[in-house]
Amino acid sequence: MASTLRLGTSALRSSSIAAKPVVQSAAFNGLRCYSTGKAKSLKETFAEKLPAELEKVKKLRKEHGSKVIGEVTLDQAYGGARGVKCLVWEGSVLDSEEGIRFRGRTIPECQELLPKAPGGQEPLPEGLFWLLLTGEIPTEQQVRDLSAEWAARSDLPKFIEELIDRCPSTLHPMSQFSLAVTALEHESAFAKAYAKGINKKDYWNYTFEDSMDLIAKLPTIAAKIYRNVFKDGKVAPIQKDKDYSYNLANQLGYGDNNDFVELMRLYLTIHSDHEGGNVSAHTTHLVGSALSSPMLSLAAGLNGLAGPLHGLANQEVLNWLTKMKAAIGNDLSDEAIKNYLWSTLNAGQVVPGYGHAVLRKTDPRYVSQREFALRKLPDDPMFKLVSQVYKIAPGVLTEHGKTKNPYPNVDAHSGVLLQYYGLTEANYYTVLFGVSRALGVLPQLIIDRALGAPIERPKSYSTELSPSLLVLSCK
C-alpha cells in the first residue's frame, strides 16, 4: 500500500467495517488539540486504501503468479533459509548496501518527515506506525489523534496487573512480558468475533482493534515489570495528554529527563521493523496465519525475540565492552583495543554488535543512534569507547576474513545510550525492544488479514531425501 490512493467515501461505505470515531479532543504535551473532523483516522485511511490494494495484489498474481522469484540451494535449506525469497512484507525492505527502508523511506527521511513532539527532534513512533500500515506520512493532527487514542485504550484489566504482580522477581522480564501479552487474549475482540462467526472480509477490522488495544497497553505492562523487578513496584498512570514514548519513559521512572524521552522516540522508531524474515517478525506472521489473535501472535514473536541470537545482542555488547575495560585497564589505546579484538576472535568468539545476516554496510540504525549520542553525550566515556571500537573493529574483522559484514549493527550502540541515562538493567532491554517491535509486526498482521493471507505451510524434506532432490534439480 505504498502508493498514495485517494478513494471516495463510497469505498468505506461499501465495506462492512465500521470505523471507530476519531477522538474529538485531546491535550497533547500541554497543548490542547481539537479534531476538526477533517483529519481522517488511521482506520478510515486504511479502509479507503484497501479496495485498491486488494485489486493490485489480485492483478499481480493473475499476471505473474507463475513467475519464478528465486532459487533455493541445499545450503540455504540447511542454513536457516538465508536469502530465500518467500515472504511478503509491506512495511519495510532491507537493502544490503543502504539498510532499511520503511515504506520506501530511509531512516533519515523518516526523521525529517514524520511528525515530532513540540520542541522534539526525533520522530514520534505513532507516525511510523501510521506509515507502516498505510504507506502515507500522517499529518501532525493525525499523529496527535493516534496518541490520544492509544492513551484512551491503555487501561490494564485488573487480572493482568495481578498476574504481573504475582510473578517472582527472578522470572526473566521477557518471560513476564510474554505471559502478560498472552493473557490479554482474554480481551481479544478477534477471538470473540471468530468464535461467534464472522465474514472473512471483517477479519482485519477485529485484528486492527486488537492491535490498537495491545499496543496501547504495552507501555504499562513493560513499566510494571520493570518497576516490580528493579524498583519499588509503583507505576505512574498514563498521562492522556502525552505521547506514547513520553508515557513509556515516565512510567519507567525517567519522564523528567527530556533527552531520555527523545531517546525513547528514536529507539521505538528504529527498532520497530526490519523486514519480515527475522525471528520475531516471521514468528508473529506465522502464528497469525493460523488466525491466532494479535495477542497470541505477538506473544509468540516476543518468545522468539527473547532468544540470545535475536534480542539479547545489545546486552552482550555491554558485557563485552565491560570485560574489555577490565582486561586492558586504563590503556584504552587503539593498539590495546585492536589486540583485545584479536583475542576475542582467536578465542573462537564473535565481536557482539558487528555483522548482520543481510547488511553489508554500517547499519543506518547505528548511525542514527551515534548522531544522537554526538548531540547529547559526546563526552561520555562509554560512548567514546564505542566510537573507538567503531574506528578499529571493521579493519580487524576484514583482516580476520570470516565475516561478510565487518560493520556495526543497531545493537552496538543502543545499550550504551540506555546505560548513560540510568537504565542500567541490561536483562530488561529486550522488553523495550519488544514494545518497539510490536509497532512493526502488528501493521503487517492487519494487512495479512485484510488481504486474506493463507496459513503458512512450506514444504520440508529429510536429509535422506536430499540426494534425490539434487538429482531432480539437475534434470
Swiss-Prot record:
Pathway: Carbohydrate metabolism; tricarboxylic acid cycle; isocitrate from oxaloacetate: step 1/2. It holds the Pfam family Citrate_synt. One of its GO terms (biological process) is citrate metabolic process. The active site is at H310, H356, D411. One of its GO terms (molecular function) is citrate (Si)-synthase activity. GO terms for cellular component: mitochondrial matrix. Its EC number is 2.3.3.16. Keywords: Mitochondrion, Transferase, Transit peptide, Tricarboxylic acid cycle. Its main location: mitochondrion. The keyword Protein biosynthesis does not apply. It is an enzyme of class 2 (transferase). It is found in: Mitochondrion matrix. It catalyses: oxaloacetate + acetyl-CoA + H2O = citrate + CoA + H(+). NCBIfam families: cit_synth_euk (TIGR01793), PRK09569.1 (NF007128). Citrate synthase is found in nearly all cells capable of oxidative metabolism. PANTHER family: CITRATE SYNTHASE (PTHR11739), CITRATE SYNTHASE, MITOCHONDRIAL (PTHR11739:SF8). Belongs to the citrate synthase family. This is Citrate synthase, mitochondrial.
